[in-house]
Amino acid sequence: MSLTTLHDTICALSTPPGKSAIAVMRITGSDAIKISAKCISDTDKIFTTRGGDSFYTNVVDENKNHIDDVIVTVFRAPYSYTGEDLVEIHTHGSTLIIDLLQHLLQSSGARLAEAGEFSRRAYMNGKISLQELETLVLRIQRQVMGTEAF
């Protein structure tokens, strides 16, 4: 990851892929709020919501067609996991809805996060220590290898 990519706005599914009741898409970076606003019906709410607060709205496409009912939570810098503005969009877990939301976010200016990029940003912004980052990496590796329960 180059230094220039540290300033990009990124998005990623933060819940396991596949069928589920709820999926959470995370968006972080300097344009996270502006990009997320392009994908919801209540654009004013995202700009006025206090950090840590949530609101109900709809994900809409470029033509303002309804895609899904969602809960949006806004975390304002520096009071987020990454230390940057961060938005969580809690949507239904349909793979079609997740794919549509991801496409909307990308077409609005976000790029897909690299593996571990949210945690790298948290480390680079002083939100977690190197020891915490290394522990997180080891835990994920164990989960992937099946040696640790979720």
Task: Kindly label every feature range from the protein language model.
Residues M1-F150:
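A glycine-rich (often HGG/GG-containing) alpha/beta subdomain
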